[in-house]
Amino acid sequence: MIESDAAVRGHIEMLASRVFQTETKWPHFRLLLRNLIDWSNRLAPDATVVSLERTLLYGGVSLFAPLFRRQHFISVDSSPESARDRGAYNAGMIDDPRCIPVPFTRHAPMNATGLQAGVADLVTVPNLVHHVGDQQGLFAEIARLLKPGGTAYVFEPLVRELHQMPDDYLRYTPFGMAAELAKAGLEAGPFELEGGPFSAIAYCWTQALEYFPEAERSRMQQWFDDDHFPQLMQWDEKYRDNLVRDHTQFPVSFSIVARKPA
């Protein structure tokens, strides 16, 4: 059964408010949601989408499958073995009646999915490239999965703490990512940037708050939520350009697309 538009809108609202907390904590994830919604609306109903994900931390649920309900969607769970030991520690984020729980399709490493070559019109890698040790193998697998003329979509952070250690390997700039996609035989297209220096400060504050003792953290959290975060977001919208140095930007995340030659 294809979920209704209203149900999918509810799922997207749940992702924004509960999982990615775009209005209260991590505004740079707006780019990811905006891009995937756009792709789901643009792709033909008979298109095949392969999403390389980590679903075990959400109890084996694909966050993005409901968006592509009209396409053939394959969720490849690429959670490492360490994820099984950690369990579904983010499952509470999707404990919401708006969530449409679609389980992952298969479990496989990102660099060896076992899927047929040339199966995908679109391959998405949402916020996971930095968790893959075999970078060359990952990009080669993305290229292998794509049909001629197919597109790869990658979302990555630029400002991020070390997390899910030890499975956290590197950070790319959009230019570095474009170079790696080109090495795999893909034609890197345009990229988008999200956030500015003030949302970077906000992100660092969300991390720093976790280092306060619990009693002090509650007080600081209220100050951050009520006063500092709203002010930072206002500044982030108002002051977009570096007025001192040219050729300089301070985004918090980016997305990029790359096409497999026809």
Where would I find each of the regions flagged by the language model?
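Class I SAM-dependent methyltransferase Rossmann-like catalytic core
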Residues: 1-45
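Conserved S-adenosyl-L-methionine
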Residues: 186-197
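Class I SAM-dependent methyltransferase SAM/SAH-binding core
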Residues: 48-112
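Conserved beta-strand signature within the Rossmann-like core of class I S-adenosyl-L-methionine
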Residues: 150-156
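A C-terminal cap/extension of S-adenosyl-L-methionine-dependent methyltransferases
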Residues: 199-262
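Acceptor-substrate binding/catalytic loop of class I
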Residues: 160-180, 200
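A short glycine-rich, Lys/Arg-flanked "PGG" loop and its adjoining helix->strand segment in the class I
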Residues: 136-148
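A conserved beta-strand element that flanks and buttresses the S-adenosyl-L-methionine
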Residues: 124
